[in-house]
Design a protein with these regions (language model features):
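Bacterial N-terminal signal peptides
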Residues: 3-18
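Primarily EF-hand calcium-binding motifs
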Residues: 90-107, 116-129, 152-164, 170, ...
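N-proximal helix/coil linker or "cap" segments that precede and/or mark the start of modular domains
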Residues: 195-243
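Thiol-/selenol-based redox modules, centered on thioredoxin-like
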Residues: 213-217, 350-408
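Structural micro-motif
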Residues: 237-239, 260-261, 341-345, 360-367
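A short beta-strand-turn-helix
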Residues: 241-261
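Aromatic-flanked redox-active Cys/Sec active sites in thiol-based oxidoreductases
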Residues: 265-271
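Structural microenvironment flanking redox-active thiols in thiol-disulfide oxidoreductases
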Residues: 273-340
């Protein structure tokens, strides 16, 4: 059991602390070449030497932390396709679902009415709405056409959501149209392309792209992602005890787990994609609040002002340094709660990140834990693996698993 608590009283103040430089001798950091200096890794020759050393040192299957380190040094794109982040893991798949419905999986489809008495549950599995569930409906891989469209729309949504609270308002849409039209009565497709597609290198907006040294430092401080890989499918969920953000309630995970499955969410204020997608998680909670428990653990900042800072955060009014005390983290969490208005309990991780590390929860991740306390679903690491629709389907199948089978 991981035990820690948040002070009952706290005050939200501006943060003036300075983030510490990463400790390159920490046992959590992969073994590094002698004399390794992140600042020198912006030189291709130095980075190539480090890659050569690491690939000799780590043969065979490599940990996620080593894969991420190699990806950075090789100059791979910061996205979900170039070995940055592993895919989600789930106990359920189409074969399991077909067996549950009494259908031969080789047929390639399951009539929706064979799945459950609840129409709502079946609808969430039938992603394309054609009345049956196919392997494509459950496919959340990067190459799936639906997933690619979701990613594109999510990026556009974030650029339209000016205050970055995950809620697009009429005022924001009106402002967007004015900016695109530039005084005209209308906006053309080209006007929107110029406005919405960043005029910068790569997939990052202006002022958001990191240098190689910054990526390395963010990895070593676990702002880019926790170095531990977290529990696997079928593992018992690591227990913990935390107070809610306002200090009024203490919650222990093992006492929440029981007849209902539990959705565990880990995230932070300075991760723009997490802010954009958080309301989707709250919407899932609203749909299943009588059938499942929902908890959020607030973890280490992904893009603090004294780390890999992003100009897009500053433009949205999100500018905080990395907290170095628990009180400061509670204060930043309070800013998150004021902006996002979460409807589920929000717990604050201890400043040395025991829960974030135990669940590999930085910068964000989703889990579904079944009624026996076992991991049924583990999302890919955020932001690219943070797929709320995928989590919801896993939750639906967890509910189906625990319910009486329908007579066929």
């Amino acid at each position: 059991l991981i035990r820690f608590a948040v002070p009952i009283a706290f005050v939200c103040t501006s943060l003036t602390v300075r983030s510490a430089e990463p400790n390159l001798t920490s046992p959590q950091i992969p073994k590094l070449p002698p004399g390794f200096d992140p600042d020198k890794m912006s030189e291709p020759k130095e980075a190539a030497k480090a890659v050569e050393w690491l690939e000799k040192e780590y043969t065979g299957k490599k940990s996620e932390a080593v894969r991420m380190l190699l990806a950075i040094l090789k100059g791979m794109r910061a996205d979900g396709k170039d070995a940055w982040f592993g895919p989600a893991e789930c106990r359920f798949d189409f074969t399991w679902l077909a067996g549950r419905a009494g259908v031969d999986p080789k047929k390639g489809s399951i009539p929706r009415d064979r799945l459950a008495a609840s129409v709502t549950l079946a609808e969430r599995l039938d992603r394309d709405g054609d009345g049956k569930v196919t392997p494509s409906d459950l496919d959340w891989s990067d190459q799936n056409p639906y997933v690619m469209q979701v990613g594109f729309v999510n990026r556009l949504f974030r650029r339209m959501d000016k205050d970055s609270d995950g809620r697009l308002t009429r005022e924001e849409l009106d402002e967007l149209l004015k900016r695109a039209a530039k005084g005209k009565e209308f906006a053309t497709a080209e006007d929107f392309r110029v406005l919405m597609i960043p005029r910068s290198a790569g997939s990052f907006g202006p002022g958001d792209g990191p240098s190689v040294p910054m990526l390395l430092r963010s990895l070593f401080t676990q702002e880019l992602g926790a170095l531990a890989e977290g529990p696997k499918i079928g593992d018992t969920a690591p227990d913990f005890m935390l107070k809610t953000r306002n200090g009024k309630e203490t919650i222990q995970l093992s006492k929440v787990i029981g007849a209902k499955p539990t959705v565990l969410l880990l995230g932070n204020f300075t991760c723009g994609p997490f802010r954009a997608m958080y309301p989707d998680v709250d919407a899932v909670r609203e749909r299943y609040k009588d059938q499942a428990n929902f908890l959020m653990v607030y973890v280490r900042e992904a893009h603090p002002a004294d780390g890999w800072k992003m100009d897009s955060n500053k433009r949205s009014g999100v500018e905080v340094k990395q907290p170095t005390t628990l009180d400061e983290r509670v204060g930043v969490c309070s800013q998150f709660c004021a902006k996002l208005r979460p409807n589920m309990p929000v717990l604050v991780d201890e400043i040395d990140d025991p829960v974030g590390r135990a669940y590999s929860g930085m910068p964000g991740r989703l889990y579904v834990i079944d009624g026996r306390g076992k991991i049924a679903y583990k999302a890919g690491r955020g932001p690219f693996g943070f797929r709320v629709g995928e989590m919801e389907q896993a939750l639906v199948m967890t509910l189906l698993e625990a319910s009486p089978k329908k007579d066929h």
